[in-house]
Curated annotation (Swiss-Prot):
One Pfam family hit: Complex1_49kDa
Gene3D superfamilies (alphabetical): Cytochrome-c3 Hydrogenase, chain B
Family: Belongs to the complex I 49 kDa subunit family.
Protein name per its UniProtKB record: NADH-quinone oxidoreductase subunit D
Length: 417
């Protein structure tokens, strides 16, 4: 009698559920996965090496392109590492703006995740709903930075500029008539803070809509419950962070455990899952959206009442105002040297980590006193999660591999770097 032999299947990299360029080599016994071997590197762009050739500030746009659905949070870790090397004090208003945009970015990420995860599993409506809300948040990005995705808004010592008093307006087109445009621009008639406040008042209702579609849906539960179970002990051993760790029942969140910026002054809860399966991680992320909305509301309230500077007064790090530059020779020299040479960061090393939507995103920067990093190491949260795919998928069906990839919320910009 011939030996029963497992067969091998290539999953991706051209696959709609591969979330970019994931190639999985699956060893199957019938339709049951015996081994899953992730092949990475197809989106490798040598970001760490590129940063060594650029001045400290020129690498800020590279950060946006790591996890390209959580743009500003990537920038935050990078500028925090520079600030620690420089010993810079960031103005409190800039800290609140950063925290507010970190949480807006968390919503952007989680909406992309819930839409694509549901689409992978077979529910299409949520994907369309999620993009409706993302559109408003892209408008917030555009208002402060001029870009809808890759903002490059954070700077060492603060942010690029203060919050604007006007919002970008829609114009009539072939797609929308004037009546529709008027309705769309109604919430955009005031300042950015007015628009964000209006959005935070509407957003809880949208999260309820997603939950109505998914949470008690029996097909959704059949596809997620008891799939990709990870115990708390294994989650710690494998280096899980973020919703992947909290879904296994461990209440670890850098915003609470190692507070940075003004998170210690804000009131929010850390959602923790029970069971460590895909469904628990789904519930954690849905509740995280509600908590992020709470944080944004508190930031809006504080920012309305407290005007002030949004970037450091140290002109060796941040450019002087254009008015000063054109009337003061010393400020002109600062401006010229800053944009030709860049910042000279003192010798030393620093690690800065933020609670990224996907987990702990860290930047380890080493300076030799020059105007560019000697070495930059990026700690991508998705890397540890993807390494656990073999263990999470073993014994499950091929269709469940799609669910497990979705629950990990993988983006290859940060994994391949």
């Amino acid at each position: 009698m011939a030996d029963i032999k497992n067969y091998t299947l290539n999953f991706g990299p051209q696959h709609p559920a591969a979330h970019g360029v994931l190639r999985l080599v699956l060893e199957l016994d019938g339709e049951v996965i015996q081994r899953a071997d992730p092949h990475i590197g197809l989106l490798h762009r040598a970001t760490e090496k590129l940063a060594e050739q650029k001045t400290w500030i020129q690498s800020v746009p590279y950060m946006d392109r790591l996890d390209y659905v959580s743009m500003m949070v990537n920038e935050h870790a990078y500028v925090m590492a520079i600030e620690r090397l420089l010993g810079l004090e960031v103005p409190v208003r800039a800290q609140y703006i950063r925290v507010m945009f970190d949480e807006i970015t968390r919503l952007l990420n989680h909406l992309m995740w819930i839409g694509s995860h549901a689409l992978d599993v077979g529910a299409m409506a949520v994907f369309l709903y999620a993009f409706r809300e993302r559109e408003d948040m892209f408008d917030m990005y555009e208002a402060v930075s001029g870009a809808r995705m890759h903002a490059a808004y954070y700077r060492p010592g603060g942010v690029y500029r203060d919050l604007p008093d006007t919002m970008p307006q829609y114009r009539a087109s072939k797609v929308h008539n004037e009546r529709a445009i008027k309705a769309m621009n109604e919430a955009r008639s005031g300042s950015l803070l007015d628009f964000i406040e209006d959005f935070t008042n509407r957003f809880p209702k949208y999260v309820d809509e997603y939950e109505t579609l998914l949470t008690d849906n029996r097909i959704w539960k059949q596809r997620l419950v008891d799939i990709g179970v990870v115990s708390p002990e294994r989650a710690l051993q494998m280096g899980f962070t973020g919703p992947m760790l909290r879904g296994s029942g461990i209440a670890w969140d850098l915003r609470k455990k190692q507070p940075y910026e003004v998170y210690d002054k804000l009131d929010f809860d850390v959602p923790v899952g029970v069971g460590g399966d895909c469904y628990a991680r789904y519930l954690v992320r849905v509740e995280e959206m509600r908590q992020s909305n709470r944080i944004i509301k508190q930031c809006v309230d504080w920012l309305r009442r407290n005007p002030g500077p949004v970037i450091t007064e140290n002109h060796k790090v941040a450019p002087p105002s254009r008015v000063d530059m054109k009337s003061n020779m010393e400020e002109l020299i600062h401006h010229f040297k800053l944009f030709t040479e860049g910042i000279h960061v003192p010798e030393g090393e620093a690690y800065a980590a933020v609670e990224h939507p996907k987990g702990e995103f860290g930047i380890y920067a080493i300076s030799d006193g020059a105007n560019k990093p000697y070495r930059l190491k990026i700690r991508a949260p998705g890397f540890a999660h993807l390494a656990a795919l073999d263990e999470m998928a073993k014994g499950h069906m091929i269709a469940d591999a799609v669910t497990i990839i979705g629950t990990q919320d993988i983006v290859f910009g940060e994994i391949d770097r």
